[in-house]
UniProtKB/Swiss-Prot annotation:
GO biological process: innate immune response; negative regulation of cell growth; negative regulation of NF-kappaB transcription factor activity; negative regulation of protein catabolic process; negative regulation of protein localization to nucleus; protein neddylation
Name used for this protein in its record: E3 ubiquitin ligase TRIM40
Coiled coil residues, start to end: 111-148
Pfam families the UniProt entry points to: zf-C3HC4
Cellular component, GO annotation: cytoplasm; IkappaB kinase complex
Protein's job: E3 ubiquitin-protein ligase that plays a role in the limitation of the innate immune response. Mediates inhibition of the RLR signaling pathway by ubiquitinating RIGI and IFIH1 receptors, leading to their proteasomal degradation. Also promotes the neddylation of IKBKG/NEMO, stabilizing NFKBIA, and thereby inhibiting of NF-kappa-B nuclear translocation and activation.
Lineage per the UniProt record: Eukaryota, Metazoa, Chordata, Craniata, Vertebrata
Source species: Rattus norvegicus
Subunit structure: Interacts with NEDD8.
SMART domains tied to this protein: RING
EC number: 2.3.2.27
UniProt KW keywords: Coiled coil, Metal-binding, Transferase, Ubl conjugation pathway, Zinc, Zinc-finger
Length: 247
């Protein structure tokens, strides 16, 4: 373990790497949160918690409120995948959790970060496929628009018949040619909606993977549920099956 001095104040004395999620002990020494958690796990066996640098007594509360069980006021050490709750040692003794699968905090963060990254890579590929399909539909619609323009006059009344939502989503000249939007216009509009929603979902997955810690494990689990293939079938249900090639 490296001694603390002015030249390495941004270095964790335990892992010797730049501080990640830095936390300060009661004696004001800084550590990576996960490094300090692992230290406390080992120290809890002896029942004596102390600073790894100066050996002064150290409280579990320095980890932060999100790492303390609000029921028993003890440090959380496991994440229950069934209930999606952070558990302390006393929680683990409850009959409610004995049949559940629990991961250590460190393993849970690693496990869910990998799942989030894997899901975001998959959906980003799907998003690219969807954007290409949307571009194809737009080209077809542009070709049809030229044909409509040579046969159908544009009237002021026909312009007023278009909904405000469609006017925002598509170029106005595509919607001005007839009283009811053609099937091709609806397809492009639906693709645009799907692309927007899927883009938001991919961004959320990527951001969650980067910022994941113990306090957001439940949110990560919920996000993985929302981005499952079964849920995405509902998101993309308005895209014609013949045109949708998403896996």
């Amino acid at each position: 373990m490296v001694p603390l001095d002015k030249d390495n104040q941004d270095i964790c004395p335990i892992c010797l790497d730049p501080l990640k999620e830095a936390v300060s002990t009661d004696c004001r020494h800084l550590f990576c949160r996960m490094c300090l958690i692992r230290h406390m796990d080992k120290a809890s066996v002896s029942g004596v918690l102390s600073c790894p640098v100066c050996r002064k007594p150290c409280s579990e509360t320095v980890l932060g409120d999100n790492y303390i069980c609000h029921t028993h006021q003890k440090r959380v050490c496991r994440f229950c995948e069934s209930s999606r709750h952070l558990l302390c040692e006393e929680c683990l003794q409850s009959p409610e959790h004995r049949a559940h699968t629990e991961l250590s905090i460190e393993n849970a963060i690693s496990h869910y970060k990998e799942r989030l990254n894997r899901r975001s890579r998959k959906l980003r590929k799907d998003l690219g496929d969807l954007q290409r399909l949307k571009a194809q539909e737009e080209k077809m619609l542009q070709a049809l628009q030229v044909d409509w323009g040579s046969h159908r006059p544009r009237t002021e009344q026909q312009n007023q018949d278009q909904t405000e939502l469609q006017q925002k989503a598509l170029p106005r000249h595509w919607l001005d040619q007839r009283e009811d939007p053609p099937e091709e216009v609806a397809k492009v509009f639906n693709f645009s909606e799907a692309v927007t929603q899927l883009s938001i979902l991919v961004s959320s997955l990527e951001r969650m993977a980067k910022e994941l810690d113990a306090s957001t494990l439940k949110d990560a689990s919920d996000l993985l549920d929302r981005s499952s293939q079964q849920k995405l079938e509902g998101l993309l249900s308005h895209v014609p099956p013949a045109n949708s090639k998403l896996s």
